[in-house]
Regions:
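Structural signature of alpha-solenoid helical repeat junctions
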Residues: 34-38, 55
Length: 67
């Protein structure tokens, strides 16, 4: 549910809220690597839209490290 809400907020242009929702989603995604990867991807997109390329790169690295 939080993943979908984050997607909606990102589509609506509210990148900060999208990132917050995705980060909250990570707290419930333990043991679900595909969900974790998707949430980190959303965080990366949100950070890009907020003008934080370094933070976006960090989120992408986190997505690559999910197992």
């Amino acid at each position: 549910v939080l993943y979908r809400l984050a997607e909606v907020r990102l589509a609506q242009g509210d990148a900060a809220q999208a990132e917050q929702l995705a980060r909250r989603g990570l707290t419930y995604a333990s043991g679900r690597p595909s969900l974790q990867t998707g949430l980190w991807g959303l965080i990366a997109q949100a950070r890009e839209r907020q003008g934080d390329p370094a933070g976006a790169a960090e989120a992408r690295q986190q997505a690559l490290g999910v197992r």
